[in-house]
Structures are given as C-alpha cells and as structure tokens.
C-alpha cells in the first residue's frame, strides 16, 4: 500500500468551497475536487519503471481498485483529490486565472527511499478552473503524453513522468484544428507523476492579484519541500539563491531539448516547471528535417513564437515573468538580473558542451562555431534529418571521410545532389578539426553515440500508435515503450523505429502539424 503525505494540501491555503463549479479562486493555492466517474475504464498501458519507483506491483495496478483509481472512479487510502490554482502568460500575454482545468492531483506518495511523487490524473473531469472546457482528454493526446513522458526520461532529459494510460469508455467531442469540424473521439486519462507540478504560473497569479501573503507562503513552501538544500540559507539570501537555481536548471533543460531536437510547442509560463522539468506534453514534436524555424503547433504557425530555434530565448522571457512575480516580495532588481545572467551563462556553457559532444570533440572551442553554423545551414537547406545525421556522423572516419555515410539522412535525393559539393567541403573541414582534436576514433564514436540517440519518438510513430490504439490494439504503444527504453543503443531488429519520416507523413495531421486540441 502506498504511503501518502499530502503536504501541498496540508501546508498551503485552500479554497473553502468544495464544488466543481467554475469560479475565480482567491487566496488559495488549491481547490478540493472529486474526479468525474467514467463508464467503463480499461487499463491500456503502464510504465514498469514508474511502478518500481512507486513500489507498486503489476498485480496491484491491474487490480479493479487501482484501475478505478486511475480512471477517477474511486480513491485508494490516503488519496485527497484537488486542483491547483495558477495563472500564466500565453503566447506573450497575461491570460489571468488558468489552473488545473482537467488535471486532478490525487496526492503525494513517499516511497521507502524518501522520494516524493505526486500523482495527477489528466482528463479526470471538470474542476473550478476548467473555464469553458469539459475537463476530459482524448485518446490521441493521452497516448502522446504517456509515450513522450517516458521517452524523455530514458533520453536523460528532466521530465514529469507517466504511470498509466486508461481508456474511459466514453466519447469526447473535439474540434482538432479549431476549424468548425468537431468529431467524437475516445476518451482517456493519463496518470502523470512528478516530484512537483508547481509552475511559474503558480507564483504569477498571486503577484498579479497583489496577494503577497499567499505568494510568500507558496515560495516558502516550495523552497522547504522541493529545494531542501536551501532550508538553512540565511532568509535574506534564500530567494535570490532559489531564483538562481531555477534559472540554471531551466537553462540546462532547454539545452537538452535542443540536443535531441525536441520542440515543446507551447512554452507558456503555466507550462514551465519550477523544478526545471519538461511538463505538459501537448502539441510537441521532434525535428525531422533540421529547421530552426519549425513548430509543430498549428496555433503558432504564423508567429512561430515557440519554434525550435527560439526555445532558449522564450525560456529566458518566461524567467523574466517569474522574476516580475517574485519582485513583488523582494523588490531588489539586482537579484533577478544576476539570476538571468546565470541563465545566459549556464545555457551557453551547456550548449557548448552539447555541441562538442554531438560532433565528437573532446571539448568546446570557439573556433568550431563557424564550422557548426555552416553545417546547420546546409542541413536546413538540404532537408537533412537531424537524428540520422548525427548518428551517422559518428561513423565517419576522419582519416578517410566518406560523404556517402551521411546520405541516408537526406529526405530529398535531388536536394542532396544539389548540396553534395558543399557537404563534401564541410566534411573535409570537419575531418581536419577532428584529427586536430586528437581523440581516439573508437572513443569518439562511443561518446557521440551516448548523446546522439538512435531512436526518438518520431511524430509519425506516435501517430501510428494512436491509430492502432483507436482500434483497440496497444501493440505499437508497447513496442515503442520497449525500444525507447534504450534510445542510444542500436537494438538490432528494431531499425524500423529509427526510419526517417515517410513521405505520407510529411503533411499528415498528427505527424507534422498538431494543435492544442486534446
């Protein structure tokens, strides 16, 4: 049986009203809310790694009582469901109160190692923060969130996790592209897991409302529970050090997104974790043909605010909004300027280390920058697959560089032929730089393969899993969970999961373009 220790409820002010009725909630960090039951829950998938972390057995999670709990139809001992209150800047503008509109936390589990895991159901029904929505989630978006949460973890990227995927047996109406064509889709619920789901927006809402008392309580609680290393810091220094840690963690997170070609798609401040975790897997995508301007989110297609190449700048902008909120408690500008400067330094250091590792150099040198910028430009113009390119680059013999090794990363044979001479020139320069670096070739190859994944959750693969799951077949979900456990290994016999995006998927909904509809 799990041990719950629901500190968020116990130590922070709550909403006195207990109904699920839509409302503005003031002076409270959370509202008690019961999940809305579903008709016929069915457990489709679960994460073995999260079961182990929570100290749950497969027998337990498959039991009717646990399936009911994961579907919102019942509670296990110690569970106290609630929805959190927060606001946020969305696409650069303050959006007011947002909150958990369809996510309902069940409580905080503490395992025998003392690790704290908050369990949260996404798609479990209406809360006071649902605005005009129904509080539900569709199978399509739930499969994507379940798969990507665990895929990112195995890539070594800080992330919230996923315990389970449950089909509800109910129909949910969604207009996938907001074009006036709503359709009935199957409902589902993901149980997300994280040490904390606190976001930048949790702090912003109280600052915007000039509720300094609640804001201070939330800051003190967050530091005490989630940043124990700061408990003994002098009070006058604690907030500055805390903000600095958040800035550095965020910088490192974004550099890791960029390393593997992950595009979040909707980096609003309510989707930014205070712990520096990847949170809220909505219209995310993985870069296929390299393009810094690519965004998977149709809502962002015109402005490309959240495109691949802008993610570092957007993260900094979001940190500025957090600084703005904290300034109401401690109006000392230098604290926040120092934190933001640390973000810049941490990102540049981490990104330099990422680039050196991806290209197989022993360390970053500024002299590499023109060489790397040139190939990124070539990859964009020639439509070169990012994941395949870096994996094959590890096979290049610097003493006898063979351009043919890289050809499998090209989507267009015609474009490859056009840019082949320039790639050949670049490869010669790269080989010279590699030889000058003096690294052992075998060591270089192994090091590159540790940071350049063979397998990522390509957009079309996720869509194939969704299409099959819609027919009741979860085999693709299971196959992807299996192969993505070891994304840096070759895994003979599983090469099809590393295949480039096929032509049919280039403009297919769910494969190249997604919306916030979920």
From Swiss-Prot:
Its EC number is 2.7.7.-, 2.7.7.108. One of its GO terms (molecular function) is ATP binding. ATP binds at residues 99, 101-102, 122, 134-135, 192, 199, 280. Keywords: ATP-binding, Magnesium, Manganese, Metal-binding, Nucleotide-binding, Nucleotidyltransferase, Transferase. InterPro entries: SelO. The keyword Metal-binding applies. Coiled coil: none annotated. It holds the Pfam family SelO. It catalyses: L-seryl-[protein] + ATP = 3-O-(5'-adenylyl)-L-seryl-[protein] + diphosphate; L-threonyl-[protein] + ATP = 3-O-(5'-adenylyl)-L-threonyl-[protein] + diphosphate; L-tyrosyl-[protein] + ATP = O-(5'-adenylyl)-L-tyrosyl-[protein] + diphosphate; L-histidyl-[protein] + UTP = N(tele)-(5'-uridylyl)-L-histidyl-[protein] + diphosphate. It comes from the Bacteria. Mg(2+) binds at residues 271, 280. It is an enzyme of class 2 (transferase). The active site is at 270 (proton acceptor). Its cofactor is Mg(2+); Mn(2+). Transmembrane segments: none annotated. Nucleotidyltransferase involved in the post-translational modification of proteins. It can catalyze the addition of adenosine monophosphate (AMP) or uridine monophosphate (UMP) to a protein, resulting in modifications known as AMPylation and UMPylation. Belongs to the SELO family. This is Protein nucleotidyltransferase YdiU. It comes from Methylobacillus flagellatus (strain ATCC 51484 / DSM 6875 / VKM B-1610 / KT).
């Amino acid at each position: 049986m799990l041990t719950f220790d629901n500190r968020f409820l116990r130590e922070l002010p709550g909403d006195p009203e207990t109904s699920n009725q839509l409302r503005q909630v003031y002076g409270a960090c959370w509202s008690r809310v019961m999940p809305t039951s579903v008709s016929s829950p069915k457990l489709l998938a679960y994460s073995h790694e999260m079961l182990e972390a929570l100290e749950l057995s497969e027998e337990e999670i498959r039991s009717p009582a646990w399936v009911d709990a994961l579907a919102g139809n019942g509670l296990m001992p110690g569970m106290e469901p609630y929805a959190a209150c927060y606001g946020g800047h969305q696409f650069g503008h303050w959006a007011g109160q947002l909150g958990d509109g369809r996510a309902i936390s069940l409580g905080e589990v503490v395992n025998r190692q003392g690790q704290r895991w908050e369990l949260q159901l996404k798609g479990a029904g209406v809360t006071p923060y649902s605005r005009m929505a129904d509080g539900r989630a569709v199978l399509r978006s739930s499969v994507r969130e379940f798969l990507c949460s665990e895929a990112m973890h195995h890539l070594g990227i800080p992330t919230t996790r996923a315990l389970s995927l449950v089909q509800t047996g109910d129909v949910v109406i969604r207009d996938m592209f907001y074009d006036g064509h709503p359709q009935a889709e199957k409902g589902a619920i993901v149980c997300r897991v994280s040490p904390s789901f606190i976001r930048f927006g949790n702090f912003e809402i109280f600052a915007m409302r000039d509720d300094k008392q609640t804001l201070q309580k939330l800051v003190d609680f967050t530091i005490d529970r989630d940043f124990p290393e700061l408990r003994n810091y002098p009070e006058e220094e604690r907030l500055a050090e805390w903000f600095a840690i958040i800035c550095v963690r965020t910088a490192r997170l974004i550099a890791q997104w960029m390393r593997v070609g992950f595009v979040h798609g909707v980096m609003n401040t309510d989707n930014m974790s205070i712990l520096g975790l990847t949170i809220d897997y909505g219209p995310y995508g993985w870069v296929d043909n390299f393009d810094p301007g690519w965004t998977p989110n149709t809502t962002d297609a015109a402005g490309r605010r959240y495109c691949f190449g802008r993610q570092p700048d957007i993260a900094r902008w979001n940190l500025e909004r957090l600084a703005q909120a904290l300034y109401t408690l401690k109006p000392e500008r230098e604290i926040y300027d120092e934190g933001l400067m640390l973000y810049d330094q941490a990102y540049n250091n981490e990104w330099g280390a990422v680039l050196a590792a991806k290209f197989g150099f022993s360390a970053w040198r500024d002299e590499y920058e023109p060489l790397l910028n040139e190939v990124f430009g070539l990859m964009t113009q020639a439509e070169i697959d990012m994941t395949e390119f870096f994996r094959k680059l590890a096979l290049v013999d610097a003493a006898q560089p063979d351009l043919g090794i890289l050809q499998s990363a090209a989507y267009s044979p015609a474009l490859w032929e056009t840019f082949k001479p320039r790639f050949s020139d670049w490869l010669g320069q790269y080989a010279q730089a590699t030889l000058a670096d003096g690294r052992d070739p075998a060591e270089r190859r192994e090091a590159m393969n540790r940071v350049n994944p063979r397998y990522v959750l390509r957009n079309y693969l996720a869509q194939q899993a969704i299409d099959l799951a819609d027919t009741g077949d979860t085999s693709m979900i299971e196959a992807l969970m299996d192969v993505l456990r070891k994304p840096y290994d070759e895994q003979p016999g599983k090469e099809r999961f590393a295949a480039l995006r096929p032509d049919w998927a280039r403009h297919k909904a769910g494969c190249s373009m997604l919306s916030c509809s979920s």
